[in-house]
From Swiss-Prot:
Family: Belongs to the FAM136 family.
Pfam (any one): DUF842
Domain of life the protein comes from: Eukaryota
A single cellular component GO annotation: cytoplasm
Name of the protein: Protein FAM136A
PANTHER family: PROTEIN FAM136A
Organism of provenance: Danio rerio (Zebrafish)
Gene designation per UniProt: fam136a
Length: 138
C-alpha cells in the first residue's frame, strides 16, 4: 500500500483507538485497579481467594481489550484483501502487456479506493465497539 494511503489509515485508526481508550478503556482500567486493591484489603482471605478476586476484577477489561483487538484484526483483514485484489488486477494488467505507468496508475487508484472505502467503515465500527464496550458488565 502506498505510504501516504497507509498513513491515512494508520492515523484514522490510531485516533479511533485513542478515543476509545480515553472514553471507555481508561475508566475500565481505573475500576479494575480499585477492585483489585479492594481484593487485597481482606486479611482473612487466602492467597487463592485474593487471586480469584483479582481475576474477576480484570475480566471486564480483558473482554474489552479482546473486543477491540478482534475488531481491528477484522478491519485489517478486510483492507488487506481489498489491496490484494488491487495487486491481482495490476498483475493481470501488466501480464496483458500494459506499461508500468498504466499499471501504477491502476494500482494507486485501486488502493486509494480501498482506503477510502475502509475509512468510511470506521464510524460504524466505532459505534459498534462503543455499544459492545458499554454492554460489558462491570
Amino acid at each position: 500500500m502506498a505510504e501516504a494511503q497507509q498513513a491515512r489509515v494508520q492515523n484514522a485508526v490510531e485516533e479511533m483507538v485513542q478515543n476509545l481508550e480515553k472514553e471507555h478503556i481508561r475508566k475500565m482500567q481505573g475500576r479494575m485497579f480499585r477492585c483489585s486493591a479492594e481484593c487485597c484489603e481482606h486479611p482473612g482471605n487466602s492467597m487463592n481467594q485474593v487471586h480469584q478476586c483479582i481475576e474477576r476484577c480484570h475480566t471486564p477489561l480483558a473482554k474489552a481489550q479482546g473486543l477491540v483487538t478482534s475488531e481491528l484484526e477484522q478491519f485489517q483483514d478486510r483492507l488487506s484483501r481489498c489491496t490484494m485484489h488491487c495487486s491481482d488486477k495490476a498483475k493481470d494488467l501488466f501480464d496483458s502487456g500494459a506499461k508500468e505507468p498504466a499499471v501504477r496508475a491502476l494500482m494507486d487508484g485501486c488502493v486509494g479506493s480501498c482506503v477510502d472505502e475502509h475509512l468510511n467503515l470506521l464510524p460504524s465500527m466505532t459505534r459498534r465497539l462503543k455499544d459492545s464496550l458499554n454492554s460489558i458488565p462491570q
